[in-house]
Curated annotation (Swiss-Prot):
It comes from the Bacteria. This is Homoserine O-acetyltransferase. Belongs to the AB hydrolase superfamily. MetX family. It is found in: Cytoplasm. The gene is metXA. Residues 47-349 form the AB hydrolase-1 domain. The keyword Calcium does not apply. Substrate binds at R221, D345. Transfers an acetyl group from acetyl-CoA to L-homoserine, forming acetyl-L-homoserine. Homodimer. The active site is at S153 (nucleophile), D311, H344. Pathway: Amino-acid biosynthesis; L-methionine biosynthesis via de novo pathway; O-acetyl-L-homoserine from L-homoserine: step 1/1. It catalyses: L-homoserine + acetyl-CoA = O-acetyl-L-homoserine + CoA. It comes from Leptospira borgpetersenii serovar Hardjo-bovis (strain JB197). Keywords: Acyltransferase, Amino-acid biosynthesis, Cytoplasm, Methionine biosynthesis, Transferase.
Length: 368
């Protein structure tokens, strides 16, 4: 554990609710939400910021769970004392999405009627349902209005949904490396990943036991991880270099890297959750053009939209579509395209300019 600039040891907490009506008409009952908080809620409860995670993320956004942890939470560079999301000033909340596998209700949860994991019997959940569950948590914490909702990638979709589903419940919205709907190409990559899982001999219609479809999930992660990088970064890091390990397994260093990414992913993620969450991403759509403008017209908060020059998964053009529609709806929006060679994952990586942009946007709003 490296405590330099960190908020230290953090405990994941759990909130349980009786039920959650879902968009498709079914009801999830009970509902458990795993979450973490950083900083102190002000007496007037007006300094709360909700951080929404991406596909493979979780509630552990900052700090460490134990002194033996080698790495902090996934956005530790941005959350903490004096950082972009300053815990000396703000009360930060991050929760695991429902349908995920990091403590919130999902396919790994025990079905109350069978006493066994839901597996593929878990109901389909949407981005709207994820946000609805977050709203339950925010109300449980006694907060009526959030100072800001922020997220990148899938987290950006959740932030957008917050702005239109609960317009009176947030003052600011930060959307990074995201989109208002998936393109055919983005859906295609997710479909290949899902088919890899479905083709695994251990799939068993999603009702697998400890013999889970690890090979299929590893392949899905390999495909997905390619989209998080950039051509320049891959050329710089790997080129056409040979692997260090078994040359019968792969001929190039980039192949060895992707195999490692896939194999390490299966130890921390669930195949069913991968299917559920990617489907939620693919089905989310606020439309284009006038339809998108109309969808965003109910929002009342300020927006910061950030894109990245080398992001080919959610290219800058998709962020500019959001900005154009927000402007057409006469909303207050700030837009920045950051030059970065890191691809889609740029929003996760430490970047002094990004740190200052986020901090400046929050500080230039009405003080909490």
């Amino acid at each position: 554990m490296n405590e330099s600039g960190s908020i230290g040891i953090i405990e994941t907490k759990y909130a349980e609710f009786k039920e959650l009506p879902l968009k498709n008409g079914s009801v999830l009952s009970p509902v458990v939400i795993a979450y973490e908080t950083y900083g102190t809620l002000s007496p007037s409860k007006n300094n709360a910021i909700l951080i929404c995670h991406a596909l493979s993320g979780d509630a552990h956004a900052a700090g460490y769970h134990s002194e033996s942890d080698k790495k902090p939470g996934w956005w530790d560079d941005y959350i903490g004392p004096g950082k972009s999301f300053d815990t000396n000033q703000y009360f930060i909340i991050c929760s695991n999405v429902i349908g995920g596998c990091k403590g919130s209700s999902g396919p790994l949860s025990i079905h109350p009627k069978t006493g066994t994991p839901y597996g593929s019997r878990f109901p389909f959940v949407s981005i709207q349902d994820m946000v609805k569950a977050q709203k339950l948590l925010v109300e449980f914490l006694g907060i009526d209005k959030l100072f800001c909702v922020a997220g990148g990638s899938m987290g950006g979709m959740q932030a957008l949904e917050w702005s239109i589903a609960y317009p009176d419940s947030l003052l600011n919205c930060i959307v990074m490396a995201s989109t208002a709907e998936h393109s055919a190409m983005q859906i295609a990559f997710n479909e290949v990943g899902r088919q890899a899982i479905l083709s695994d001999p251990n799939w068993n219609n999603g009702l697998y036991d400890e013999n889970s479809p690890r090979k299929g999930l590893a392949l899905a992660r390999m495909v997905g991880h390619i989209t998080y990088l950039s051509d320049d970064k891959m050329r710089e890091k790997f080129g056409r270099n040979p692997p260090r390990g078994n040359i019968l397994t792969t001929d190039f260093a980039v192949g060895s890297y992707l195999i490692y990414q896939g194999e390490s992913f299966v130890d921390r993620f669930d195949a069913n959750s991968y299917i559920y969450v990617t489907k939620a991403l693919d089905h989310y759509s606020l439309g284009k053009g006038k339809e998108l403008t109309a969808a965003l017209s109910t929002a009342t908060c300020r927006f910061l939209i950030v894109s990245y020059s080398s992001d080919w998964l959610y290219p800058p053009a998709q962020s500019r579509e959001i900005v154009k529609s927000l402007e057409a709806a006469d909303k207050r929006v700030f837009y920045l395209e950051l030059q970065s060679g890191e691809g889609h994952d740029s929003f996760l990586l430490k970047n002094p300019k990004q740190i200052e942009i986020l901090k400046g946007f929050l500080e230039n709003q009405s003080s909490p």
